[in-house]
Swiss-Prot record:
It comes from the Archaea. It comes from Halobacterium salinarum (strain ATCC 700922 / JCM 11081 / NRC-1) (Halobacterium halobium). InterPro entries: Ribosomal_uS2, Ribosomal_uS2_arc, Ribosomal_uS2_CS, Ribosomal_uS2_euk/arc, Ribosomal_uS2_flav_dom_sf. This is Small ribosomal subunit protein uS2. Residues 1-22, 33-43 have a biased composition (Acidic residues). The lineage of its organism: Archaea, Methanobacteriati, Methanobacteriota, Stenosarchaea group, Halobacteria. Residues 1-54 are annotated as: Disordered. GO terms for molecular function: structural constituent of ribosome. The keyword Ribonucleoprotein applies.
Length: 249
């Protein structure tokens, strides 16, 4: 899949895999990058005035105030060239603001994509503490599989490992924290959907969902929307509310 620079709804990120990794991956894991204690979430600017999207007429899945209240738009103080097109502006405190209309659009696109897969062949991962419960709830809602916490090397690449699985698509909470899962997905040739913040590299990601991927409320909202939209495209009635994705946090 390759990215269409016209930024149409169906655009996908170009998958540029590295060389195939050996089955015996390094045991150095992302726990060092994603400590159990997550950073405090920055305080949003006034939700009545904050400019968070380029398309002010966009028909969003939820009110823009709900995105703001969850901090979905709050990026980091760093940005990559890969994520530049998803950034709307920079705040006075130096934080980059993600374009909420692009987030909303990419949730829909990801749901369209996932609805084509057997639910049990979808794997979602999260090494980040605040992403674990929402990721597990997403898997429960759509019938997917979840591997949260430390991703064991060989899960996708070593048939001799007891926990070996063969999913058809991978959803990750953070390409940095979930780098082992992404690396193995590239090795076995399955597409990767990733929640990406302003500081993420996306060269190994097939479909970016731009969002604050460090805040617990932001991840709850995005995973909840993705679950509901995926179910909707299958013709199933969503039965989970946002509270269900936040109860375990």
């Amino acid at each position: 899949m390759s990215e269409n620079e016209s930024d149409t709804e169906a655009e996908l990120e170009e998958n540029a895999p590295d060389e195939a990794a050996a089955d015996a991956e390094s045991t150095a894991q992302t726990d060092e990058q994603t400590p159990d204690t997550e950073a405090d979430e920055p305080a949003p600017e006034s939700t009545a005035t904050e400019d968070v999207m380029s398309d002010e007429e966009a028909d969003l899945l939820i009110p823009v105030e709900d995105y703001l209240g969850a901090g979905v738009h709050i990026g980091t103080q760093q940005k990559t060239n890969d994520m530049d097109r998803f950034i709307h502006r920079v705040r006075t405190d130096g934080l980059y603001v993600l374009d909420v209309s692009r987030t909303d659009d990419r949730v829909r696109t990801a749901a369209d994509f996932l609805a084509n897969y057997d639910p049990e062949q979808i794997l979602v991962t999260s090494s980040r503490q605040y992403g674990r419960f929402p990721a597990e709830k997403f898997a429960e809602a759509v019938g997917a599989r979840a591997r949260t916490g430390r991703f064991i090397p060989g899960t996708l690449t070593n048939p001799d490992y007891d926990g070996y699985i063969e999913p058809d698509v991978l959803v990750v909470t953070d390409p940095i924290g979930d780098s082992q899962a992404v690396k193995e997905a590239i090795t076995v040739g399955i597409p990767v959907i990733a929640m990406c913040d302003s500081n993420n590299q996306t060269g190994n990601v097939d479909l970016v969902v731009p969002t604050n991927n460090k805040g617990r409320r932001a991840l709850s909202v995005v995973y909840w929307l993705l679950a509901n939209e995926t179910l909707d495209r299958r013709g199933a009635e969503p039965t989970y509310g946002l509270d269900d994705f936040e109860d375990g946090l």
